[in-house]
Amino acid sequence: MKTSSLLLATTRETPADAVVISHQLMLRAGIIRPLAGGLYNWLPLGVRVLRKVEAIIRDEMNKAQAQELLMPVVQPMELWEESGRAEAYGPELLRFKDRHQREFALGPTHEEIITDLVRKEIRSYKQLPANFYQIQTKFRDEIRPRFGVMRSREFIMKDAYSFHMDKDSLQKTYEDMYDTYNRIFTRLGLDFRPVQADTGSIGGEGSHEFHVLADSGEDDIAFSSDSDYAANIELAEALAPRGERAAATEELTKVETPNKHSIEDVCDFLQLKKKKVAKTLVVKGATEEHPVVALVIRGDHDLNEIKAEKLDLVAEPFEMATDEEIQNAVGCKAGSIGPVNLSIPVIVDRTAAHMADFVCGANEDGFHFTGANWDRDATPTLVADIRNVVKGDPSPCGKGKIEIRRGIEVGHIFQLGNKYSEALNATVLNENSRAQILEMGCYGIGVTRVVAAAIEQNYDDKGIIWPEAIAPFQVCIVPMQMHKSPRVEEAVMTLYNELTAKGIEVLLDDRKERPGVMFNDMELIGIPHRIVIGERGLDKGEIEYKHRRDEKSQDIPEAEFMEFLLGKLSGN
């Protein structure tokens, strides 16, 4: 293609409302243009990238024997009511009525629709297992869409749904999809990690997320320095410290700490490090007998709410106790609470349970205890893992130390079990001709988010550096003064025609622009292989080549150039 035939909408200015680099570069490179909050037009360059991402996904899904179909974006609300998610999903589900006053929603996901289809079309166990997928537009009415297409309201997803007679069959397909996703993201050229994850609002029994590692990511990923172990920080297990707890050497002493309510205030006042202080938080309990519960973690650690709410004594969903509830249960403000002489259940983190001679609140405003020790001064109701892991913790797999990086979630796979099939009564006849509820799996990839994530991982101060597999064009040709030199024009067109005849995607910059403008645009839009042809090079019988990741260009003899370029395109 020639730039004269392409909507090349590059800009030099960085929009003020674009915070993350992918949003900035997608706007500057003419990949997208905003329409309304969280809604974007995809321009021709962007669509070329999208189609390449989709093609890789489609190829791998087809190889995995998944069947492509297409379901409506508009969904009848009665299916959401039947599944029980009509209210549970919340305001992100955009609802509306048609002219007949029937209620519909714009689909953020398609579990209900595919389950309804399967219960109508699949009758016998002989038709299973079956795995269906689509690449379709979704809509989620985000309250604050941000980061461009990273968190937009309208987006494109590949979502797949598998159906099974038993959990063993589901497990096999789940493992197949896990392997398929690894192949997809590898082919996309991304540095990613599959991580153990929480099932969230989708529900189900087992889950993995696939994260592209990038500093702009919204999720913290914990992974081992010496193995393949990786997990969302919400699920990564914090192991108990090894060895015996140190013996008590101090007496329990109450000290005055006037107006010192935060860990920082107490540590500054008492000249202590945070790891010497036990932080006590009061949360809502799960029973009438214990309406509030105390959680104790070390002062330098953060509470993990996901882990905490899975405990029997803690209310689900997780919620902090109110000031009034704390005052009624303990008799002081939140910043003065401690486990000593506490009349409510005390759940202690594994690491906090290893502390000796620690400082904690005295359950009296303006006072703390020093020299506190477990068993002697306070007895835990339960010791459990309730904190986030931190860098340097031993890896739960037993190999290496925990490292933590930011990640952008681009894929998620779930073992749903029978959550939706039971709610919608999706059954088939088993070998005994009896109706049996189906087991389900769910497998999603954010197609538009993949594009943004690829940029977050591949850019420099000049613009985008696309992974080869998803670049809008493989090669760009930048002629020097082509419109003034028939010789240059002939050489350029000859090479352009030869490359396109070989099926290579070439962008020829045939604009009447200064060379600097053309160079800047080609680097901004991130085409991997750049060719420059000019009078000076032709005089020497050479063609200039530069890869987008290289600092310097190379001059290649004309006679050798095609073989050289084909080698570069094949990765040699």
UniProtKB/Swiss-Prot annotation:
PROSITE patterns according to UniProt: AA_TRNA_LIGASE_II (PS50862)
SUPFAM superfamilies hit by this protein: Class II aaRS ABD-related, Class II aaRS and biotin synthetases, YbaK/ProRS associated domain
EC class name: ligase
Lineage top rank: taxon: Bacteria
Family the UniProt entry places it in: Belongs to the class-II aminoacyl-tRNA synthetase family. ProS type 1 subfamily.
Domain statement: Consists of three domains: the N-terminal catalytic domain, the editing domain and the C-terminal anticodon-binding domain.
Protein name, as recorded: Proline--tRNA ligase
Provenance organism: Hydrogenovibrio crunogenus (strain DSM 25203 / XCL-2) (Thiomicrospira crunogena)
Gene designation per UniProt: proS
